[in-house]
């Protein structure tokens, strides 16, 4: 009985440790996207277009352009045109039309998460 219980526990742990979230990052390298975020308790929406080399973001009647440097299929660095500190993005999981990501200022440990939806 003890061996049977250990075997069942082993199978259960093996099955759960093998789970990996879906990451079809290449599907989200380029395209048009929306991203909702919160500032001081107010929900805001940003739209951006990303190409292999650039990201153009439209938010609050402003346009911000940044260069994109891909580290691998799931990670990239954005450098804004105003030469602010670069931001590192990592795609954590994907669905058919969206991806969950984390981002942080390069060199800083504090990370935030978000979800972007592909609109095209």
Regions found by a protein language model. Name each.
Residues 19-21:
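Bacterial signal peptide processing site
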